[in-house]
Curated annotation (Swiss-Prot):
It comes from Penicillium rubens (strain ATCC 28089 / DSM 1075 / NRRL 1951 / Wisconsin 54-1255) (Penicillium chrysogenum). One of its GO terms (cellular component) is nucleus. Disruption phenotype: Substantially down-regulates penicillin biosynthesis genes pcbAB, pcbC, and penDE. Up-regulates expression of laeA. Leads to light-independent conidial formation, dichotomous branching of hyphae, and pellet formation in shaking cultures. Decreases the expression of the class V chitinase chiB1. Decreases the expression of the transcription factor atfA. Residues 25-233 form the Velvet domain. Residues 1-23, 41-60, 258-361, 491-524 are annotated as: Disordered. This is Developmental and secondary metabolism regulator veA. Residues 12-23, 258-268, 497-509 have a biased composition (Basic and acidic residues). Residues 438-485 are annotated as: PEST. Belongs to the velvet family. VeA subfamily. Pfam families: Velvet. It comes from the Eukaryota.
Amino acid sequence: MANRPSLMPPHNETEHSVSRITREGKQLTYKLSVMQQPERARACGAGAKSSADRRPVDPPPVVELRIFESDPANDTQKTDITFAYNANFFLYATLETARPIAHGRVGGPQSCPVLTGVPVAGVAYLDRPSQAGYFIFPDLSVRHEGRYRLSFHLYEEIKDAKDADKDSTLPLPNQIPLSATSKPGIPQAFLHFRLEVKSVPFTVYSAKKFPGLATSTSLSRIIAEQGCRVRIRRDVRMRRRGDKRDEDYEFGEERAAAYARSSDRFTTPDRYAASMDRPRSNSNGSNIESPYGFVPPDRRPSAPDYGFQCPQPYQRPMPPAPMSHSQTPSYQSHLSFGSTPSHYPAPHMPPTPPPVAPQGIYSPQHAYAQIRHPSNGSEYEGTPIAYPAPQIPVERGGYPKPPMSSYAMDPPKPNSYMDPRMPEPSLYPSTPNVPVSRPQTPNLPAMPPPKPLSNDYANHVVPSVECTSPGGSGGGGYDNVRGKRMVYQTGPTYGKRSHEDTFGLDDRSMQNGMRPDTEPYPAYRDFSGESRAALMAEMGIQLSYKRANGKIVMKAPPSST
């Protein structure tokens, strides 16, 4: 540190000049001017990470050097020889406090210098803003906060003997004997101190109180354009004192707003926000996914859309019509909530298709008669051909009367859904019947009068649609469209309990020796997943009889064990 400054501004603040007489009798005048004063700085501290967090003094100090030559007798006529003068110059910067500080008697020297960075600058001869020599200090930092000023010291290395001082006794570089060059310790060049200039006081702030950095000055830009290394900032980094949110950041509100706009632009939009307002369907059948991955395009209107309220607590969907291999299904949805099939479009049939179900509004009993289920006989070996479901008059409780030459018609099963997405029949060969458990009412047996089965069922093949409940196994590997048994089986979905578990088993067929007045339904082999033909072939036709109410009942022979 240089001499302690006084309370009054020093005489060499901002500008200072000094003159000397050379050996040739000429007068040289050196003039230093602080062209760009330091204004603010952020304290970088003295810890281990201080070097990584250094903030330079802003704006960077710039000192101008000019050299004039004149006659010692006439000082008014001076010639600027800054560019023509042959010598080496450098400027050394030191830091001193703007106010004198009274130290104690036992106060030791400072452990580390307060000024850090690059305190030495060489001269740069520039044409702008004017032809002169400039010293730039772009990397000066202060460790502690306070009020300081910079002091710049000019040193010169003389190259020509004619430019040496008149009364100087120091040898010139070209006058040093060559024999002495090999001896260590003998200087080969000498530096001459010329003058000192001081900057105006500036403030060093702590990290929390630092107001920020301003844009680069025009002088810094001009110097940088000529090849000097000066940091240029084209945006304002000043921070408002009342804004506590940006205390720990260097950019202000403008940069924060720009950052927020850029972050909002890359935010992923919420595509599912509007799906929360979608009204819920009247059925829970849509919650069950299909195992085949086909989703119909849209949903068929439910029963309230037709103005018809279904009286049953559980509503039954309508099965789809079978389609040919070369046609696209024209149905709208796999859901039907007990409504009539009047809006069900006619399916595409093979050549010469029979007429489809007539249009019109039907009662719920007619809707029951239109539902098809797995038929008996040799449906696994025949080619699946689509037949429309005939209208059957309803008798006694809404159960259809079974025809002698058609497939069975069953009453509706509660809480069921259908799956129109089926694979091609050629992909799955015919396999033996696999028993599958299904917690719903078994199909009402529809059997012809006692006679050989091959005469009635062998030549009649009807594709059937199997309706399963959400609590069931979802078809048990049965092709609902083609009428084929599939190799694989789908797992149970574990849904609601069936209608029989709640309201009893009165409508179920009597099997394994059961009687209507005996104990509840015992544990037995579940034939609901098998075809009627396989069941009758296993039990025998002689055990089938008609009840008094007109129902055909199959009775298992008594067990031999």
